[in-house]
Amino acid sequence: MFKSSTVALLAAVVTTPCRAQSTAAPDAPGPIVVTGQRDSLHLDTATDAGSRLRLTARETPASIEVLSQEELQLRGLRTARETFNDVAGAIAGNVPGNPAVVSLRGFSGNTVSILQDGVRVSASTVVQRDTNSWHYDRVEVLKGPASVMFGEGALAGVINKVTRKPVLGERHLDGLVSVGSFDTVFAAGGINLPVSSTLAVRADASYQRSDSLYDVDNNQSFSAGLTGSVIFRPSDALSLLIAVDHFEDRYDATYQGLPLIPGQYARDPSDAVTGAAGLVADKALRRRNYNPQGGFSNADETTLRSRLDWRLGGGWTFALDLTGYTADRAFVLTDSQSFAAPNAAFLNGSFRQSFQDFRHDHQFWNARGVVGNDSHVGGLRNRFSLGVEYNYTDFKTLRQQTTAAALPPIDAFDPRPFPVPAGPGIFGALDVMFNSRLNQTSVFAEDGVNLTDTWLLVGGMRWDHIELDRETVTNATGVADRNRPTYDPVSWRIGTTYDVAPGVALYAQYTTAVSPVSSILLASIANTRFELTSGRAYEVGFKVSDTSGRLSVTGAAYRIEQKDILTRDPANPTLAVQGGRQSSQGVELTAAIVPVKALRLSGGVSYTDANYDELGEGVAGVRVDRAGNRPINVPSTTLNASALYTLDGDVTLGGFLRHASAFYTDTANTIEVAGHTVLDASIAWRFTPQASLTLRGRNLTDAFYGEYSGYPSTNVYIGAPRSAEIALSTHF
């Protein structure tokens, strides 16, 4: 029902003309043409991810990157994963249980928080899906710890997806339709309508289906979104926004990555991955899918939220956010493959597999109130905010898993998937229900004082009181294990920004953060008995732009430290204890330049030196020291660059480059994924002022490369092969 209604709405949006009553809204870009002068790195834009003081990115003593909807379309970033992968210093992968999971500044998974409109529902590895990027006005990225803003988990950074909002007094209609390789079809549309001088509504819909975005066998995918909102502003002092967001996705026979096999059995071995015992990535297995018939991963989530903004006078403001969220998710797939050498039954070799059936029933409620003031104290401008936040989460998850011996083997080169196994007996003791209820109350404050017109000092603090009621029930016996831990972490930061010259700002900050040893909602009973890990970070940097807006450059150097991660007891290697340490240090540089009106160049480069400073791992009952090793899925160097050139005002040529250096899939650093470089290109023709046609090629060199590691270290996600698409975009 949702699919058909979405398609009908999109058809209407894309084909129906609409008379413009005023200039286009900032979040509704028309057909893309390089225009030259602009704030290319959004340094003078206030962000919700960086502060609640309404500081601009230039004023904030931290590294902030913003990708606008226009930039998402220019670069052909269709989904959340593609968007996150384009952030300087980040890589992202589509692990089935953690779609669009991010690695940033030497850390990954739960240490990177992902928000929607400034609200963190749960750990990113629980809630994030590879949603269509059409629905976002912009994506804000705060790099480095942000627990002082958003609580536990935000150690490496925060990604805030800001949805499109209504604009008063404007009427416009936008559409985007594309078709491409692997039978991929995408359609999206949005409409902004003024109801009166004080009331406006906006609705956006998107639909994407593909035989497989990665060109993998039996891996059909579908994703759709429907977002709508209404804004009521009876006066300049008062506004109320009410919004609803709904997203769905489904991936058939979910791709778990390419399993590595011993080199002597490979038909077309590659150097994309090298591993212990001669394991290689065999190109002959590039499209193979070993999931059972009927296997799938899907999510169905709905968010209802409201935002009240009230200017009280005298520089005082009040904001109230209310959010309700509900989601159902399923993960029915084979989660690992173990290679067996050829024998009489399987001349090509075979895989033994384990199978899982995981389900999520997730409810979340949030209320946040913030009082702010922007005035002068002692002759100095002072911006202040004080807030209280309450979250309640009810999370139930059925977790059923087999051993590898419970399933029949499958041919490595000619897999004939078996049906999804049935019957509760196949799971045995690995059939449990996790019930989690989480109450969290937070108090936070920020203050920013201008010591001079060019010198800003910013500080903040947050206290969280977290109550977890965690129960694990073994379904076969009804036996329950329970724990009710509480946590009371305090996070804080202090930073300063100094304008040394017009358009040139230097900054420095020190900040702390906390993060659980694993996702709070999915942690084992044993892991809930551990304290939260603690982190701290130092960062210095600069932000530069010229008065014409043609040149913007930012740079940062940082060090992040995390302590009390899980390690193994030296006296008893079978026992997990806290006491491990992990750190990263690095530099980042982003730049955007418009040397002539028709040409725009932009890019970002990062270098990260990340290590386990203290970590012991249990191997066959023995504690093995992993100190000095690099964390999983952390490349030392990343690079992204783009060039856009407009010919005669109507045709724009684009080139886009992404590079990531080698990374490891295991803490032992025995399996290395080689570095890779991917080149995309586009040509866009604006054939009317309201419409443009774009031809885009992806991975033009048809590079065979690993982009991320999944759950088992011997499975690596292979990037999508060369593909092409053609897209029509309209704006009325």
Predicted features and spans:
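Surface-exposed extracellular loop regions of Gram-negative outer-membrane beta-barrel proteins
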Residues: 250-252, 256-260, 394-396, 467, ...
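Short acidic/polar hinge/loop motifs at secondary-structure boundaries
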Residues: 92, 103, 119-143, 162, ...
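Membrane-embedded beta-barrel scaffold of Gram-negative outer-membrane proteins
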Residues: 307-313, 317-323, 327-333, 499, ...
